[in-house]
């Protein structure tokens, strides 16, 4: 995992003080608001408002009146209508919200959700023909359809009326439908353009019902679920919808949602937007990823508690299968990358595999992107030699533009700067890999691939009280464009490091101004840290109140930890001694002893390098390795002593090593028999200096 570049906001102290005084918010909350450019009482009131009166008139959306007229007419005539959805959480919740409402009004309404694995995204000609043959006379799309001009034309030619509801970007020429309702229409004057697909569907039922508040009361939980899962900005109408939806979620009348909460172990627990993102959405998405989106749709539409419980259990089982497929592909890719990936040269990873599950390669892309700190494209090749791929990017590398430079190789592709999809023939994948590598080499530096961590403000230890932390709840619900606040505190002393869950996570005890803070860092073990007990560090974190056995305490949830300036200064002093040694300069006996490793030090470094190397390679941030070895061996190994150990091994033909872009890169060399380091010049030189 590459280091992050911190971007720390510096809210104006006087503005924070005035905002706190005039609004009654704590200085901590006021500092977060000010850091985000919200530094007047009115701006704060507008930004934080969850007042349902802020919901706009649904008829403000272009063509909404036409959509309502067409749907009412079809209901009155008793003709069959079908809601055409999508297989992700947004599409499923949009489908279920609209179908449930229309059925409650007596509509003959069915739904159709394409199979991710066989149909792909969006409308298809075979689906249009099938639906017409089954008696469909009105097709209503949700979360799809805005660019399906050809498919809509087919539906119209067959004799179906079409109402499109979508939230994706529009092309210049809209489909020829009876109504096209999309908050991103260029000719739309609706005041909020960031609705989810389920948000647009919700607006449609509000228009049909003529009572927005009653529809919010009835469907806010499903609409919030789709809105958060689709990573929509939690501002404006979305903030109101999600705030109301989270209230409803804990007491939901939707039997399917209730059973899913139970199966996920979340019933009677505090529910937040994170609950949706990390607990509910993965289970619902798993159904779509595994080609069984209809399970999730049935779950949210059924009125039978026994059936709902069975479906919720099946969704959780599908999620386990998804995790299994994901981990299988991840292990395969990691094995190959240990052989093929060169961290010194490769700025993009492009891998293809036969039979990889198309529904999960996007998740694996994201995990590899985080692990290696570079863009990743994974391609699943089927038995017909057709590759379907997903890509994820990082930093400032625009993946869509990179793919556009290779567009002659694709059958189709699409996406945006940070995520994309593609279809390519297997015999063109090697050329694609070569061209993407060349593109990355000329369009991005390693420094530009470093991910940024945006920090709202630096805090003082006295600010971290339960009262102040609880006051931050006014900022909720969190999500896109209203992220959970990130704070940082500098020059904290690491008192204790405790591995958790077989060293998959770590708990830290940090000291600042005599105050002890408990911190937890998920997804990293003690052996992967770049610091040890006793080091001084800067920590970036979320703040929360931890409740355990009736006891409440302040807890820091770590986002990142970096060595403080004083540690870098200490390293530099040692490195100056090491550089003097390398330049044949004089060292005092005391200085030489600081650099001179004994046998146990050499063994500790060798053991760490050989155990951590993957296929003979180890790449770590240049200041981290000495501290990791020190942590594991409980020995005093500074950065200069580490380099001397590496020099000894290099002289003996055991390794080679060098630096690039802030990374220390070690390559193990094959050798036979017992390694002999007795002839090391650097070791002999230090021993003579040390006396």
Feature annotation, model-predicted:
Residues 1-4, 476:
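Catalytic domains of riboflavin
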Residues 142-195:
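Histidine/acidic-residue-rich, glycine-tolerant segments that coordinate divalent metal ions
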Residues 89, 117, 145-146, 168-170, ...:
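Conserved nucleotide-binding/hydrolysis micro-motifs of P-loop NTPases
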Residues 137, 178, 538:
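Conserved acidic residues
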Residues 2, 9-138, 158-159, 209-431, ...:
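Hydrophobic helix-and-loop "lid/oligomerization" segment in the mid-to-C-terminal part
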Residues 97, 175-228, 600-602:
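Short alpha-helices
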Residues 98, 103, 239-336, 370, ...:
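Acidic, two-metal ion nucleic-acid-processing modules in DNA metabolism proteins
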